[in-house]
């Protein structure tokens, strides 16, 4: 069968592969475009495997929501350049929507979720890797499913927050989500702060005190330490922080004024916890030359 330019063009549009690769695939498969597409996909999967050990620390947080059901997914790429690529961005939306419509509890379970095309998320990931030329990872999935107010907020594709608010309204829930994105509190309220953390902070504050202060009566000393610990606890709790949308009140005051309660929240930031590889090309060359 003759390999025409229009056939090559059609295969390129279907697969996103290069012109020469498409032509070769058609030649190898006697002009059968379906077989050629499969051949390219297999080739793409092989390329994907070779990229699997690269560090993927850039990427995007995507969200999907339907009423009180909402998800956040973190999809990583190796570079910020690919994180802005339309193929990558489209993939993150596919992943978020698939997560919302599935009962997958985490990113590992999400891999086997099937799309309308019949592909799994993992198969689609490999196909996108072949297009963009970088390792991609579906790293994290968090979800909230509740009859309460649920807000999903993503800031710049880099930080995502889900908040469940009992009482109040969705606008307040969204405002709190924005606050969490900006201030990153580890806990909701003081009772959520681990006792070990409080004990350690007391130790530190006591060690920082002057001998003169340490010589004060025990009840006075306890008040001083308690005041310092209270300030620290406020800093690490959502309720204790000044509300970013109205710094004249704390988040707790804003929530209670609406007769509401924050039940829980989830916050993801791109690449947190991933050790980025810093390339030192000079050192690498010296090592290869036996000079280091």
Swiss-Prot record:
NCBIfam families xref list: tsf (TIGR00116)
GO molecular function annotations of the record: translation elongation factor activity
Residue numbers spanned by region Involved in Mg(2+) ion dislocation from EF-Tu: 79-82
Primary role: Associates with the EF-Tu.GDP complex and induces the exchange of GDP to GTP. It remains bound to the aminoacyl-tRNA.EF-Tu.GTP complex up to the GTP hydrolysis stage on the ribosome.
Signal peptide: none
Main location: cytoplasm
Gene (name only): tsf
Pfam family, one: EF_TS
UniProt protein name: Elongation factor Ts
